[in-house]
């Protein structure tokens, strides 16, 4: 997925969760870039056969098994993205933290909270 599509998807998720703030746009942009890189690494990983280990020949001529660089990139991007998802309130822990700080928009216009409120729960 492209960076702009990721930006739209992330912003929509923030709005639905009630956590969107205008000043989060730069964080959303950074996260979208990370996810675009992850998607490209995923494509490369799949095109290479999806093997978690590859053979690598070092300068000395010795051949060793090593982690697939594309898989390493995917794992790194996922770890970095998780921190951003959390900061945006798009994980349970992140949502709770933003709620504790009073940064959640109560009039989000959807979501589980509105459904539960409509049911009187």
Where are these regions (language model features)?
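Residue-centric detector for conserved, function-critical "anchor" positions
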Residues: 26
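Short, charge-rich amphipathic alpha-helices with coiled-coil/heptad character
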Residues: 5-22
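Amphipathic alpha-helical protein-protein interaction segments
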Residues: 29-104
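Charge-dense (acidic/basic), low-complexity helical/coil segments
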Residues: 9, 16, 83, 96-121
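Alpha-helical structural motif
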Residues: 6, 37, 77, 108-111
